[in-house]
C-alpha cells in the first residue's frame, strides 16, 4: 500500500488529499515505484498518469520451446499457468524482449509472442524470392532453423541456405547435423 511504501502517512488523509489534488482524474491501478521523500502531489500525478513499472522478459534466439517456456515460467510478475510444450510446438514464439505489467498472464504473453511470430513470418513469406522449393511459411521457418543450427556466423547463413535450397531443388536430402 501507499502507507507501507511511505508515500502517504495515513489512508484517510490520502483519500482526503485526493479530493483536492485529483477531483476529476481517476487513479490508475498498477505497480508503481516512488522515490524516497516523494511529495503527495507528485505521487498522485504518477498514479493518475498510470506511470507503472514495466517488467520485461528476454527470449534469446535459438532456444527450444521447452527452454522458452522455462524462461516465461521464471519471469517474476507473470501469473497463470504455463502451457505444455505439446500445446505450442517448436518455432511457435518469436524470440524478442517483451514488456509486461505485474499480473499479466503467461498465456497473454505467449499469445503476443505467437502473434509476433505469425506477423513476422507472414511478412517474410510474402517478400520471398520466386521459385523457392518451399510450400509454406512453416517450411521456410524450419529451413531457417536448420540454417541457424548449421552455422553460428550470420555472414555464412545465406550461403548455407543456398546449399540447402539447391539440394531441395534437386530432390536431395539436406544432410544437416
State the predicted function of each range:
Residues 1-175:
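Conserved catalytic or metal-liganding residues and their short signature motifs at active sites
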